[in-house]
Swiss-Prot record:
Originating organism: Streptococcus pneumoniae (strain P1031)
InterPro entries: UPF0346, YozE_SAM-like, YozE_SAM-like_sf
Domain of life: Bacteria
SUPFAM superfamilies, A to Z: YozE-like
Protein's name in the database: UPF0346 protein SPP_0954
Family: Belongs to the UPF0346 family.
NCBIfam families named among the record's database cross-references: PRK13672.1
Length: 71
């Protein structure tokens, strides 16, 4: 069974990094409502588009999601 996207993303946290993956990891960590138990692209993408208290480049998100699928 695949780890949730959030669980995988948390391994990339690094507040000193300018890497989009590290930035998203830190933002997701601070966002209480981030979907933590899903591996569904649409659910996470919809959250980022409609409900996140932060803005994030969705093109970068698509690339990060592809890395997640390949891990």
């Amino acid at each position: 069974m695949r780890k949730s996207f959030y669980t995988w993303l948390m391994t990339e946290r690094n507040p000193k990094s300018n890497n989009p993956k590290a930035i998203l990891a830190d933002l997701a960590f601070e966002e209480a409502a981030f979907p933590k138990h899903t591996d569904d692209f649409d659910e996470v993408s919809r959250f980022l588009e409609e409900h996140a208290s932060f803005s994030f480049n969705l093109g970068d998100f698509d690339s990060i999601w592809q890395e997640y699928l390949e891990h």
